[in-house]
């Protein structure tokens, strides 16, 4: 069993929608509802904690009711940064020894991916899902190519990311004490010298971040429903 944390207090500035991107529609259903439905079907998910902007609480609650989400969903106040939201949410994890952290804007996560992440988290204490980088990656300095990075060992990291609650709490507390801001939760665990296991993600498991991503998400959904 695990508790799911969804940091959902972001403004989504790159989307340029003027509102929380999780409320935007894919095939007439809000992004966050697609995401919640993926975990709604998973019996191992004991509880969902969503760190939100308090001003949007009634909007989220209305979606839960409208779309019949039956899983136990708890709303808490999110922080200024994603990292702050996850740390705050960890204080409310009481029922399980393991936690998954997932981007609310990744609506195409699969049950297979969820459980592979959870299995490795139980084995190693921490796990991520990732896919090989397909593009050539270059390091650029002052608008000029500095070097081409060998991509064979590079991975594009996704969510969900899985952890023992005790380990993730230790990593967040260490980062907080040092004023360290990581790009994801796994980076905080790496920082304290702990191993993070890797499982195969999916190129379909996109994070809907820009208007172009909305179009891609629509096409993915149509393919899934054929």
Swiss-Prot record:
Protein family per UniProt: Belongs to the IspD/TarI cytidylyltransferase family. IspD subfamily.
Name of the protein: 2-C-methyl-D-erythritol 4-phosphate cytidylyltransferase
Site (Transition state stabilizer): 14, 21
GO molecular function, one term: 2-C-methyl-D-erythritol 4-phosphate cytidylyltransferase activity
Gene: ispD
NCBIfam families (UniProt xref): ispD
Protein purpose: Catalyzes the formation of 4-diphosphocytidyl-2-C-methyl-D-erythritol from CTP and 2-C-methyl-D-erythritol 4-phosphate (MEP).
Pathway, per record: Isoprenoid biosynthesis; isopentenyl diphosphate biosynthesis via DXP pathway; isopentenyl diphosphate from 1-deoxy-D-xylulose 5-phosphate: step 2/6
UniProt-listed Enzyme Commission number(s): 2.7.7.60
PROSITE patterns for this protein: ISPD
Keywords linked to the UniProt accession: Isoprene biosynthesis, Nucleotidyltransferase, Transferase
Record flagged with keyword Transferase: yes
Recorded catalytic activity of this chain's protein: 2-C-methyl-D-erythritol 4-phosphate + CTP + H(+) = 4-CDP-2-C-methyl-D-erythritol + diphosphate
Domain of life: Bacteria
Residue ranges crossing the lipid bilayer per the database entry: none
Record site feature (Positions MEP for the nucleophilic attack), residues: 151, 207
Alphabetized InterPro entries for the sequence: IspD (IPR001228), IspD/TarI (IPR034683), IspD/TarI_cytidylyltransf_bact (IPR050088), ISPD_synthase_CS (IPR018294), Nucleotide-diphossugar_trans (IPR029044)
